[in-house]
Amino acid sequence: MPRVPATLYACLLGLCALVPRLAGLNICTSGSATSCEECLLIHPKCAWCSKEYFGNPRSITSRCDLKANLIRNGCEGEIESPASSTHVLRNLPLSSKGSSATGSDVIQMTPQEIAVSLRPGEQTTFQLQVRQVEDYPVDLYYLMDLSLSMKDDLENIRSLGTKLAEEMRKLTSNFRLGFGSFVDKDISPFSYTAPRYQTNPCIGYKLFPNCVPSFGFRHLLPLTDRVDSFNEEVRKQRVSRNRDAPEGGFDAVLQAAVCKEKIGWRKDALHLLVFTTDDVPHIALDGKLGGLVQPHDGQCHLNEANEYTASNQMDYPSLALLGEKLAENNINLIFAVTKNHYMLYKNFTALIPGTTVEILHGDSKNIIQLIINAYSSIRAKVELSVWDQPEDLNLFFTATCQDGISYPGQRKCEGLKIGDTASFEVSVEARSCPGRQAAQSFTLRPVGFRDSLQVEVAYNCTCGCSTGLEPNSARCSGNGTYTCGLCECDPGYLGTRCECQEGENQSGYQNLCREAEGKPLCSGRGECSCNQCSCFESEFGRIYGPFCECDSFSCARNKGVLCSGHGECHCGECKCHAGYIGDNCNCSTDVSTCKAKDGQICSDRGRCVCGQCQCTEPGAFGETCEKCPTCPDACSSKRDCVECLLLHQGKPDNQTCHHQCKDEVITWVDTIVKDDQEAVLCFYKTAKDCVMMFSYTELPNGRSNLTVLREPECGSAPNAMTILLAVVGSILLIGMALLAIWKLLVTIHDRREFAKFQSERSRARYEMASNPLYRKPISTHTVDFAFNKFNKSYNGSV
């Protein structure tokens, strides 16, 4: 389903809901307006007749009617019906080139000033155009993280200025470069604060024992066209060391944005702020860990030495404050971060307008190409931002980009080339009158541009006849003021001509206070006095009408809210604000909430009803019908186009391929970038067993950017003998390797056992002993020769 029918469906839904209401009800007469100003507020089609004698003298509402009805009833020439209008006050033509040295004569947006006069409920429309001119001056401020982890990056950008200037001067002849650095707040727990670390926080760190003291932000080089000064300043820098992983870079970003004179931002130049880091940032409320409870004031705090003096006094800035100050000073922030933190900073870009994020290599060697890519991305996009929009104004945008197709609800164009013009239709509507403030203004500005459109707003909330007041007029019996064909009675008097006093007995005319015979006086919600109803007051709202039959609180509710908070209650029926329809105004006609990430309405698988997707494709589900397991995937749908292009030698304008490639912008390349975060990479095998590769990205305008290889990748057929030899050789090598491993293990085991034996042997200790079974061959006997026969003694020896 294409996008236009989805938008058309929403419009038809609104018309279908509105036609029965207009056909069956004249909202002007049912609104029970009691004055010209009230009549104008009911509906932009309502008009007031200021003729003295007109219509039913008892019915004020007969004066408030459609203009055609008033003319038909004889009120010609005295009708109050102001219309909304637009007047262009200043409209300088767009420039084609940023030719001057300062760029002060370059106009990239037209018109520059418009005055609109608005009647509540009625839209007025004006056109504006934006162009990215060629050769526009560029100011680039390089803001670098000098914490210890960025040491190798610092080494690699020593000559960055020269190389970067060479590349940028291919894009603009007027280029200037500046430099600043940051680490973190010099307080605990963000930095090392012990006395021994004050002069050298790297003490005790073996890998890099010497570094400079920690600091918040230092502005080192104002914007200059002397790139040698940049190189010289970079060569002077040394890294420092902080304590925790996050860095204090957002402090530095804010100072670089608001210290315009110190940095040297030119008024008429494209402002680029390159933020390089390898870690996450501290944000608002982190400062409370260090006792910093004062929120950041968003002001410049650089001293004479260009150092940030409030680093240890105020908290880190919030994302909202950063976005405000960057937009206020027309600065495009480029996050150059390492791959592991890419998604975090990618999410930041959705919260901070005008920011882009690129992946920085670990050693910053790709920084030049990164900056060139970011510059090209910024120059290829135009997005309108609204400043100081009054609360009672509704704005509606329709973008017409380079393809000439209108996209309702969109205020951004992408994929532009330098010199392309993006057109926007802006519709302005006042929901109500602002009260005392009769005139207001707001500004439309493309993100990152100095050009802007100032819109002065005046409200048509008063009638011309109100200027001719007649106090104590004879037309009002001397008891009131005559204005716009009516009498405004003084206190205590009633009647169309103020002819009655309150409290007079008019019982004979009480039937004039009944809406119909048998109905209660003044619908039971008022008193009949002087032949007319005086309605009671109610804590719920206003009771009004000739017979007090109407009120402002008896309309349909949604979740307990009258008219869903998107309309006004008039006599039992909701009058919806612009952008809402339905009996209780709960149905939004805005289709922006139905846009999928690829920019398509309901992922091209459903329709947008009341701001929500109703999936019509079988199997599709999700908030924007983005999930569909049974649907053909995007690669399959794009494959038909690619195959047709290959068959017809890459000619997308070929009649045969026109149907398959009607929404694709074709780019032929020799190699596909596989790490592109935004692109979807697709493969398929051709009939010749070759691999065809292509990638695509969905553009916001509903088209696809299709990047296709010029030739499929075809590998040569494998050699059977080579495969056989490789298999046999592999088996032999594996077998020999296993045998060698086995032999090695056995040898190691034997050596361990032998060493164990030797160790035990050396520790052994033996005791001397004789064998009890062993007898010596020689025996010795001693004889006593003084042997006495009787005394059995012998003394001697043998």
Swiss-Prot record:
GO cellular component: cell leading edge; focal adhesion; glutamatergic synapse; integrin alphav-beta5 complex; plasma membrane; receptor complex; synaptic membrane
Transmembrane found in the keyword field: yes
Annotated I-EGF domain residues: 465-499, 500-549, 550-586, 587-626
One BP annotation, GO: cell-matrix adhesion
Signal peptide residue numbers: 1-23
SUPFAM superfamilies: EGF/Laminin, Integrin beta tail domain, Integrin domains, Plexin repeat, vWA-like
The entry's keywords: Calcium, Cell adhesion, Cell membrane, Disulfide bond, EGF-like domain, Glycoprotein, Integrin, Magnesium, Membrane, Metal-binding, Phosphoprotein, Receptor, Repeat, Signal, Transmembrane, Transmembrane helix
Coiled-coil spans in chain: none
Domain PSI: 27-76
Keyword Metal-binding belongs to the record: yes
InterPro entries, per the entry: EGF_extracell (IPR013111), I-EGF_1 (IPR040622), Integrin_beta_N (IPR033760), Integrin_bsu (IPR015812), Integrin_bsu_cyt_dom (IPR014836), Integrin_bsu_tail (IPR012896), Integrin_bsu_tail_dom_sf (IPR036349), Integrin_bsu_VWA (IPR002369)
Domain VWFA: 136-378
PTM sites of type Phosphoserine: S770
UniProt-recorded Gene Ontology molecular function terms: integrin binding; metal ion binding
Cytoplasmic topological segments: 743-798
Glycosylation sites: N347, N460, N479, N505, N586, N654, N705
Binding site for Ca(2+) 1: S149, D152, D153, G362
Disulfides per UniProt: C28-C46, C36-C463, C39-C64, C49-C75, C202-C211, C259-C300, C401-C413, C433-C461, C465-C484, C476-C487, C489-C498, C500-C530, C513-C528, C522-C533, C535-C548, C550-C571, C555-C569, C563-C574, C576-C585, C587-C610, C594-C608, C602-C613, C615-C625, C628-C631, C635-C682, C641-C661, C644-C657, C690-C714
Topology relative to the membrane: Single-pass type I membrane protein
Binding site for Mg(2+): S147, S149, E247
TM ranges: 720-742
Domain remark from Swiss-Prot or TrEMBL: The VWFA domain (or beta I domain) contains three cation-binding sites: the ligand-associated metal ion-binding site (LIMBS or SyMBS), the metal ion-dependent adhesion site (MIDAS), and the adjacent MIDAS site (ADMIDAS). This domain is also part of the ligand-binding site.
Function per UniProt: Integrin alpha-V/beta-5 (ITGAV:ITGB5) is a receptor for fibronectin. It recognizes the sequence R-G-D in its ligand.
Assembly, per entry: Heterodimer of an alpha and a beta subunit. Beta-5 (ITGB5) associates with alpha-V (ITGAV). Interacts with MYO10. Interacts with DAB2. Integrin ITGAV:ITGB5 interacts with FBLN5 (via N-terminus). ITGAV:ITGB5 interacts with CCN3. Interacts with tensin TNS3; TNS3 also interacts with PEAK1, thus acting as an adapter molecule to bridge the association of PEAK1 with ITGB5.
Protein name: Integrin beta-5
Organism: Mus musculus (Mouse)
Lineage: Eukaryota, Metazoa, Chordata, Craniata, Vertebrata
Encoding gene (name): Itgb5
